[in-house]
């Protein structure tokens, strides 16, 4: 915060014990930092008390849900990972005044959460005595298909996409839709450089095509943007000269 950053504390997406409930209450009652609520229990703790962010795991897919949250104090919402540009345009047209929109723009997508830790299980250890072995797998454990293609990444309690969601080429469309904030999920290396590339495109000092070319060697796997274009999530699409879409072959 001293460096001019807006610090946001996130609540857990999966509450499964009294200790988790205690942590939830501590985070939502911190009294200093903005809180991102990632389930409706957190929303209940925050409603009417302080402005908050509705995280992507609140699963806000329609205008009635977004409008219901507005008087409770939501100041920003993060769209679900599967939401595409066409659906977002509908919600943006009826977005409550004063509510910002944030889009997950880069990173492996968190697709599901489990009460069990996959990394601990992989090492034949219980979750409560995991010895923090996830440190040995900073970008998670890659799961491949029988055809030896990257399919998912297991990272602690998260199941993530093997490919990296990348909306850097789509920044102009994000801006035209009135998106206020882009979310970049950190990786074990090169995150600072990736943020700088996005910053350059947003500020207009870099073209999207040049920045995307510089981004490729910094990514831990091939990219994808299918969800954004209303296609299967693992696919990559780009605009053609006629304003349509054409598929791009991405290899892991």
For each feature predicted by the language model, list its residue ranges.
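A cross-taxonomic marker for long C-terminal extensions/tails that follow the last structured domain
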Residues: 73-74
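Active-site pocket-lining/capping segments in soluble small-molecule metabolic enzymes
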Residues: 1-60, 64, 78-252
């Amino acid at each position: 915060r001293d460096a001019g950053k807006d610090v946001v504390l996130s609540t857990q997406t999966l509450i499964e014990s009294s200790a988790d409930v205690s942590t939830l209450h501590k985070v939502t009652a911190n009294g200093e930092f903005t809180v991102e609520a990632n389930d409706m229990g957190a929303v209940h703790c925050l409603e009417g008390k302080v402005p908050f962010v509705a995280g992507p795991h609140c699963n806000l897919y329609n205008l009635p849900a977004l409008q219901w949250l507005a008087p409770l104090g939501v100041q920003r919402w993060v769209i679900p990972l599967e939401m595409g540009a066409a659906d977002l345009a509908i919600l943006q047209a009826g977005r409550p005044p004063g509510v910002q929109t944030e889009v997950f723009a880069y990173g492996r997508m968190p697709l599901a959460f489990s009460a069990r830790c996959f990394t601990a299980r992989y090492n034949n250890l219980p979750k409560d005595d995991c010895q923090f072995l996830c440190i040995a797998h900073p970008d998670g454990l890659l799961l491949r298909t029988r055809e030896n293609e990257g399919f998912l990444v297991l990272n602690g309690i998260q199941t993530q996409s093997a490919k990296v969601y990348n909306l850097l080429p789509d920044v102009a469309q994000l801006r035209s839709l009135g998106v206020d904030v882009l979310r970049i999920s950190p990786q074990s290396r090169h995150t600072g450089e990736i943020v700088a590339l996005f910053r350059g495109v947003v500020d207009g000092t870099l073209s999207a095509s040049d920045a995307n070319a510089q981004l490729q060697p910094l990514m831990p796997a091939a990219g994808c943007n299918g969800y954004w274009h209303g296609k299967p999530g693992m696919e990559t699409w780009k605009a053609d000269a006629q304003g349509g879409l054409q598929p791009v072959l991405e290899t892991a």
